[in-house]
């Protein structure tokens, strides 16, 4: 963790940025059959915005916490919408709803 990553290790930020752009381009061109030339929002954020997050916060810890909070928010919403009497049925419903919500094939 660095307090000022742009001053203390700018070469690492630049290296990450260049590598992430190359990786995104590789996914887009070489795996068209799999991703239809598109990538998920989470992967886009990882590849495109992590250098900005590191510059701003000094690490990706805040970004990881943001992802956890977002996931918890989704599960709370699904749980509220799909509340059932039995805990096992409730969890099953939440997981199925989450799978349907996140599946790119459906």
UniProtKB/Swiss-Prot annotation:
Its EC number is 3.1.-.-, 2.3.2.27. The keyword Hydrolase applies. One of its GO terms (cellular component) is nucleus. Its cofactor is Mg(2+); Mn(2+). GO terms for biological process: adaptive immune response; B cell differentiation; chromatin organization; T cell differentiation in thymus; V(D)J recombination. The keyword Metal-binding applies. GO terms for molecular function: double-stranded DNA endonuclease activity; endonuclease activity; histone binding; metal ion binding; protein homodimerization activity; sequence-specific DNA binding; ubiquitin protein ligase activity; ubiquitin-protein transferase activity. Binds 1 divalent metal cation per subunit. Mg(2+) or Mn(2+). A divalent metal cation binds at residue 69. It is found in: Nucleus. Coiled coil: none annotated. Keywords: Chromatin regulator, DNA recombination, DNA-binding, Endonuclease, Hydrolase, Metal-binding, Multifunctional enzyme, Nuclease, Nucleus, Transferase, Ubl conjugation pathway. InterPro entries: RAG1. It holds the Pfam family RAG1. It catalyses: S-ubiquitinyl-[E2 ubiquitin-conjugating enzyme]-L-cysteine + [acceptor protein]-L-lysine = [E2 ubiquitin-conjugating enzyme]-L-cysteine + N(6)-ubiquitinyl-[acceptor protein]-L-lysine. Belongs to the RAG1 family. Homodimer. Component of the RAG complex composed of core components rag1 and rag2. Catalytic component of the RAG complex, a multiprotein complex that mediates the DNA cleavage phase during V(D)J recombination. V(D)J recombination assembles a diverse repertoire of immunoglobulin and T-cell receptor genes in developing B and T lymphocytes through rearrangement of different V (variable), in some cases D (diversity), and J (joining) gene segments. In the RAG complex, RAG1 mediates the DNA-binding to the conserved recombination signal sequences (RSS) and catalyzes the DNA cleavage activities by introducing a double-strand break between the RSS and the adjacent coding segment. This is V(D)J recombination-activating protein 1.
């Amino acid at each position: 963790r660095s307090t000022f990553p742009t001053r203390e290790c700018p070469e690492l930020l630049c290296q990450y940025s260049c590598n992430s752009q190359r990786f995104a381009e590789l996914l887009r061109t070489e795996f068209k059959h799999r991703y239809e030339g598109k990538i998920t929002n989470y992967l886009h954020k990882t590849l495109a915005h992590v250098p900005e997050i590191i510059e701003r916060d000094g690490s990706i810890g805040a970004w990881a916490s943001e992802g956890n909070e977002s996931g918890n928010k989704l599960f709370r919403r699904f749980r509220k919408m799909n509340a059932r009497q039995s805990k096992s049925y409730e969890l099953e419903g939440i997981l199925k709803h989450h799978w349907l919500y996140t599946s790119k094939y459906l």
